[in-house]
């Protein structure tokens, strides 16, 4: 199975399955000399880990990270950094009933027909459990970008189902279990999740990610555009079905006289481009929005087929998120960091 490595100079290779003994990653290309401990990485994993509130999956994982290599005396050596996260709360028995079935909307069908042999427990390699390794790797990138470039990345829930969230206060984002920038709407979100659980259903979401302090010039033309890499990175996240940069699809209805980001001696007058022109960073905040589908792991019975091609009814058991968009916030932040870190190293290698 290929497709497990991301990046050109700052590369991340993830490994492991949802119900295997552990997941992890190998980060290669991290510059030497950066202070790094497990305690530096852990807060980022704590934002993503399951079982923290009743509004997400009740699978409870500590997600304690171990640094196995690439760090000596508290500093990176330039060697590959291996990170390991133990799986401790698997309940594989929940999946016995569906080991020969294809859950609608999941990768069961495609993995089976591509590889002929799949790990059905919790989705195996296709599970969002894999993203914990991305968050751990992204933490290293974020720490470097913050310390050496003063670059900040922040993500938040922009919409859940038909409930649109008004951006009120950035400081409120990490003070509630929804990564909501408006504390006045958190009760609406809680009620929404409770209603979905009672109905045995799920809903999609929209997440926004901002990067501030991005140096002008990051990115390359044509095929390696910064926005092209960001779209590629975001689309690799489980359940993501759409990506917008800046104004995104709203640009369809905008006039050129409005959409163009006019410039003055003091800077740009708007940021409809989302901080990127010609695939290269303008120095403005980079703005990315992603759309996530509703998970198909629901208790409402549905039609499917089994490995013999016979029509059957399936009910998904196990512990799942009514809205996967909530925990997608730290994952999307991590992917933004990995892209920017990689492009920063590529920029340094080519330009002064």
Swiss-Prot record:
Family matches, as InterPro entries:
Chorismate_synth (IPR000453), Chorismate_synth_AroC_sf (IPR035904), Chorismate_synthase_CS (IPR020541)
Kindly list the residue ranges recorded as spanning the membrane. Answer: none
Q: Which UniProt keywords apply?
A: Amino-acid biosynthesis, Aromatic amino acid biosynthesis, FAD, Flavoprotein, FMN, Lyase, NADP
EC number of this enzyme = 4.2.3.5
**So which domain of life are we looking at?**
Bacteria
Kindly state what the record says about how the cofactor is bound: Reduced FMN (FMNH(2)).
- GO MF term set: chorismate synthase activity; FMN binding
One GO-annotated biological process of the protein: aromatic amino acid family biosynthetic process
Q: List the record's Gene Ontology CC terms alphabetically.
A: cytosol
Instruction: List the pathway annotation.
Output: Metabolic intermediate biosynthesis; chorismate biosynthesis; chorismate from D-erythrose 4-phosphate and phosphoenolpyruvate: step 7/7
Q: Where does FMN bind?
A: 125-127, 238-239, 278, 293-297, 319
> What quaternary structure, including any partners, is listed in this protein's UniProt entry?
Homotetramer.
- Known role: This reaction introduces a second double bond into the aromatic ring system.
Q: Which family does it belong to?
A: Belongs to the chorismate synthase family.
Q: What's the protein called, per UniProt?
A: Chorismate synthase
Q: Which gene encodes it?
A: aroC
């Amino acid at each position: 199975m290929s497709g497990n490595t991301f990046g050109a100079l700052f590369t991340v290779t993830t490994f492991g399955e949802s119900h295997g003994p552990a997941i992890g990653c190998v980060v290669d290309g991290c510059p030497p000399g950066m202070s790094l401990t497990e305690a530096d990485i852990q807060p980022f994993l704590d934002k993503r880990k399951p079982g923290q509130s009743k509004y997400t999956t009740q699978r409870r994982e500590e997600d304690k990270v171990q640094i196995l290599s690439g760090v000596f005396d508290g500093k990176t050596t330039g060697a590959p950094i291996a990170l390991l996260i133990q799986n401790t709360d698997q309940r594989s028995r929940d999946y016995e009933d569906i080991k020969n079935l294809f859950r609608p909307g999941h990768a069961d069908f495609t993995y089976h027909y591509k590889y002929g042999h799949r790990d059905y427990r919790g989705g195996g390699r296709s599970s969002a459990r894999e993203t914990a390794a991305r968050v751990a790797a992204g933490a290293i990138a974020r720490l470097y970008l913050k310390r050496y470039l003063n670059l900040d990345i922040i993500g938040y829930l922009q919409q859940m189902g038909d409930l649109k969230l008004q951006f009120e206060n950035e400081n409120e984002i990490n003070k509630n279990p929804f990564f909501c920038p408006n504390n006045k709407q958190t009760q609406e979100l809680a009620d929404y999740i409770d209603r979905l659980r009672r109905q045995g259903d799920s809903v999609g979401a929209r997440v926004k990610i901002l990067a501030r302090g991005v140096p002008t010039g990051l990115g390359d033309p044509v095929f390696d555009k910064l926005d092209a890499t960001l779209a590629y990175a975001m689309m690799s996240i489980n359940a993501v079905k759409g990506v917008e940069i800046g104004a995104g699809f709203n640009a369809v209805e905008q006039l050129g006289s409005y959409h163009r980001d006019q410039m003055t001696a003091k800077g740009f007058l708007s940021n409809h481009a989302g901080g990127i022109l010609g695939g290269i960073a303008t120095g403005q905040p980079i703005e990315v929005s992603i759309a996530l589908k509703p998970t198909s792991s629901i208790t409402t019975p549905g039609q499917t087929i089994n490995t013999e091609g016979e029509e059957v009814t399936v009910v998904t058991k196990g512990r799942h998120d009514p809205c996967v968009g909530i925990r997608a916030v730290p994952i999307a932040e991590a992917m933004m960091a990995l892209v920017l870190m990689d492009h920063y190293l590529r920029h340094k290698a080519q330009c002064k």
